[in-house]
C-alpha cells in the first residue's frame, strides 16, 4: 500500500511539473508524435519511419493520419485541417524562395473527400487518410524537411473554448456571464480571466474577440500561408 502511494505521489509530481511548465497544451515534435503512433498502431519494422521514409501504402497512410491527429493539425469531427499549423512542422531551405508556390501547386491536385466515406468500420476515414497522406507528401517534398523541434502552435477553436470554460470556473465567472460576451468586461473578476486563458493557452488571447468569432473554422484551402476563413 505504501509503495502504491509512493508511485501515485511520484506520478502526480511529474504531472505537476509538466503542466506547471505548459499549463495546459503540450505540443509535440513530429518525431515525438510519430513515436507515439508507432506504439499505438503496433507497427512492425519501424526503422524506415524513424528515418522519415514513407511508402505509398496503407500502413504509412494510417501512421500519417495518427501523427496529424496527435499533433492537433486535423479535427475529424469538423473535417478541418490547419494547413498553416502543418507548415510549422517543416523547415524550408533559407535560399528557397519558391517553396510556397510549389506546395500550393501540389495542394491543388489533392482531392478533399467527405468526412466519412464508408459505412463500414473497417473503412472509416479511409478517404481522409489518403487525402492527409497526399497533403503530407506536398509539404514533405515541396515545402521543406521535417522540423526536429516542437513548434509553438495556437490552440484550436475547440481547445480554446474548453480553456475559457475551465478558466471561468477557476476565477469564479458563471456560465451565464461567460456567454454574455461584452457584459463580462464589467465583472469584478474579469481581469483575472484573460490572464488564466493566456497562461493555459500559451499565448495572448483576446477573449471577447474570440467569443464574437467563435464560429470561424479552419478549412483545407489551397493556400498554405492563410488557412483561415
From Swiss-Prot:
The record's annotation in InterPro entries points to:
PBP/GOBP, PBP_GOBP_sf
Protein name according to UniProt: General odorant-binding protein 69
Q: What does the UniProt entry say about where the protein is found?
A: Secreted
Q: Which UniProt keywords apply?
A: Disulfide bond, Olfaction, Secreted, Sensory transduction, Signal, Transport
The UniProt entry, under PANTHER family, shows: GENERAL ODORANT-BINDING PROTEIN 99A-RELATED, ODORANT BINDING PROTEIN-RELATED
Name the species this protein comes from: Anopheles gambiae (African malaria mosquito)
Q: Which Gene3D superfamilies match?
A: Pheromone/general odorant binding protein domain
Gene Ontology biological-process annotations: sensory perception of smell
Main role? Present in the aqueous fluid surrounding olfactory sensory dendrites and are thought to aid in the capture and transport of hydrophobic odorants into and through this fluid.
This protein's record includes keyword Disulfide bond: yes
Q: State the family it belongs to.
A: Belongs to the PBP/GOBP family.
Which N-terminal residues, if any, form the signal peptide?
1-20
Q: What are the record's GO terms for cellular component? A: extracellular space
User: Can you list the disulfide-bonded cysteine pairs?
Assistant: 66-106
The GO molecular function terms of this record are: odorant binding
Amino acid at each position: 500500500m505504501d509503495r502504491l502511494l509512493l508511485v501515485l505521489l511520484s506520478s502526480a509530481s511529474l504531472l505537476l511539473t509538466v503542466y506547471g511548465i505548459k499549463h495546459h497544451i503540450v505540443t509535440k515534435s513530429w518525431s515525438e508524435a510519430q513515436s507515439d503512433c508507432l506504439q499505438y498502431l503496433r507497427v512492425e519494422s519501424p526503422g524506415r519511419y524513424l528515418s522519415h521514409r514513407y511508402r505509398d501504402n496503407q500502413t504509412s497512410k494510417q501512421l500519417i493520419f495518427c501523427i496529424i491527429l496527435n499533433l492537433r493539425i486535423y479535427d475529424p469531427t469538423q473535417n478541418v485541417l490547419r494547413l498553416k499549423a502543418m507548415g510549422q512542422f517543416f523547415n524550408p531551405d533559407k535560399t528557397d524562395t519558391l517553396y510556397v508556390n510549389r506546395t500550393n501547386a501540389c495542394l491543388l491536385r489533392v482531392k478533399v473527400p467527405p468526412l466519412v466515406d464508408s459505412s463500414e468500420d473497417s473503412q472509416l476515414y479511409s478517404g481522409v487518410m489518403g487525402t492527409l497522406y497526399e497533403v503530407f507528401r506536398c509539404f514533405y517534398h515541396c515545402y521543406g524537411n521535417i522540423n526536429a523541434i516542437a513548434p509553438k502552435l495556437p490552440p484550436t477553436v475547440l481547445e480554446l473554448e474548453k480553456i475559457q470554460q475551465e478558466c471561468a470556473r477557476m476565477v469564479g465567472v458563471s456560465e451565464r456571464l461567460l456567454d454574455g460576451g461584452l457584459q463580462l468586461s464589467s465583472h469584478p473578476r474579469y481581469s483575472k480571466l484573460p490572464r488564466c486563458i493566456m497562461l493555459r493557452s500559451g499565448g495572448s488571447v483576446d477573449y471577447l474577440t474570440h467569443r464574437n468569432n467563435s464560429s470561424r473554422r479552419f478549412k483545407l484551402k489551397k493556400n498554405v500561408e492563410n488557412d483561415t476563413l
